[in-house]
Amino acid sequence: MDRSAYSRGVSTIGERRRRPGPTVRDRVTEFRDGARLEREDRVITEEPLELRVGWPGRPAERVAVTMRTPGHDFELAAGWMVHEGITTPRDVRAVRYCTDETLGELEEFNVVTVDLAGPPLTLPAARLVSSACGVCGTDTVQDVLARAEATDPVTLSVATVLALPDRLREQQPGFGRTGGVHAAGLFEADGTRVVVREDVGRHNAVDKVVGSRILTAQRMPPVLVLSGRIGFELVQKAVVSGLGALVAVGAPTSLAVSLAREAGVVMVGFDRGGRFVAYAGAERLRD
């Protein structure tokens, strides 16, 4: 690899302009010691980023859409292109945001093109996109809602919510031996454990528990419990499967919260140490 490529400099067009920050302010409900507290909190920002690649004589082509925290987008794009084998460091000539004037302010910061000196080494799943480019969190949420399974509203007791992480942990032998796997579990609204699966990938663990019900043609329990944080794609899986509540020991992202609220899903994070924070559906949590 040509190490000089890292020091010669690459054109980064528009990255100094104002863009979404890494966190957003939100109103949440904290449950602690039998009390409810409405307060403001900070949530990590999550937005889709469309990655494109262009080279002389060809229009830019979309190669991926990834979820990320805004900031250092050009670094993300350049690193991703090299790591995926699409190009080498020496062939990256410029990185820029989409500048279509018809786009909203947030949309134009969610599309990045990496201009290469010549054709890419490979182009996985490449396809042309329209000139009216743009991708934003609102559109992403609406796309998921269009595929959502109908679900009945779920009501949970505070005591049940507080007990769920421990009930999940009881069925995590892999974590007990290694500390290196995630877990997902499906539970009834009264806290009855139905199925728990582990995997090195939290997304895979969710696929496994949902798949276990699909393959046995059994009813889908309404509550999904996660051992880590809640990203957009995990809420997407829950909504598409018709689940009514997500409970996690970690924090959610901004786009995950938006989708949960739009879909009418109860979302609980930081469920540990005798407390938790409700980001969506707090009105369906009873004492």
Predicted regions and their residues:
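Short intrinsically disordered, low-complexity coil segments enriched in acidic
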Residues: M1-D2, L226
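Feature captures the catalytic cores and cofactor-binding loops of soluble hydro-lyases/lyases
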Residues: R202-G281, D287
